[in-house]
Amino acid sequence: MGSVRETQLRWAILGFLLLQAASETPSQFSTEAMTLSSSTVADHLPSSPGPTWSQSQKHTSGLSADVPSSGRSSDSMSGDTSHNVTSTSPNMSFRTTADSTVPPSPTSETVLTVAAFGVISFIAILVVVVIVLVSVVSLRFKCRKNKESEDPQKPGSSGLSESGSTANGEKESITLISMKNINMNNSKGCPSAEKVL
């Protein structure tokens, strides 16, 4: 049982190293490198239940020929794994990591979604700009109307201020008169207060 796990671990390490080599130099990734590295692992493979060496070699050689050059989608790769149900888990993990390195091609649906989002955001920005411009223009007209309505009233407003000042003057004169009356009343009672004033 331990030898099966060791074999799986070796396959996982081999797959990881091959994946790194493929990502660093994809042009040098070929079937020769795959068969050379897999032949070194073949010496250590025990006779255990599962796929034979020829099946796994066929499986990996098909993988090395398809991954870097053909750019097939992940659906075609997963179709291969459904045919080979008895393949070992390191091969499966290598396939999933190889599939994750291939970027998905944009479909027309995603392109349309992005375009629709762009158009909607552009319209929203235009609406906000129009609202700001309308509010600025309306505030300017209101300010002009207020200035125009104040301009004819300026002589009248000075008249209002004069009438206000005369009203204030009347209040002061009333206050002075009442103070005189108080002083006169006090002076009648007290002759020295009259001399002070």
From Swiss-Prot:
According to its UniProt entry, the protein's GO biological process terms are:
angiogenesis; apoptotic process; cell differentiation; chemotaxis; negative regulation of angiogenesis; positive regulation of endothelial cell apoptotic process; positive regulation of proteasomal protein catabolic process
Region (Disordered) residue ranges read 40-107, 146-172, 178-197
Extracellular topological domain: 24-113
**Per the record, where are the segments of Polar residues compositional bias?**
50-63, 83-107, 155-168, 178-189
What keywords were assigned to this record? Angiogenesis, Apoptosis, Cell membrane, Chemotaxis, Cytoplasm, Developmental protein, Differentiation, Glycoprotein, Membrane, Phosphoprotein, Signal, Transmembrane, Transmembrane helix
Q: What is its main location?
A: membrane
Q: Hey, which stretches end up on the Cytoplasmic side?
A: 135-197
Record's bilayer topology term = Single-pass type I membrane protein
Modified how: May be heavily O-glycosylated.
**Entry annotated with the keyword Cytoplasm:** yes
Q: Which family does it belong to?
A: Belongs to the ECSCR family.
Give the protein's function. Regulates endothelial chemotaxis and tube formation. Has a role in angiogenesis and apoptosis via modulation of the actin cytoskeleton and facilitation of proteasomal degradation of the apoptosis inhibitors BIRC3/IAP1 and BIRC2/IAP2.
**Descriptive protein name:** Endothelial cell-specific chemotaxis regulator
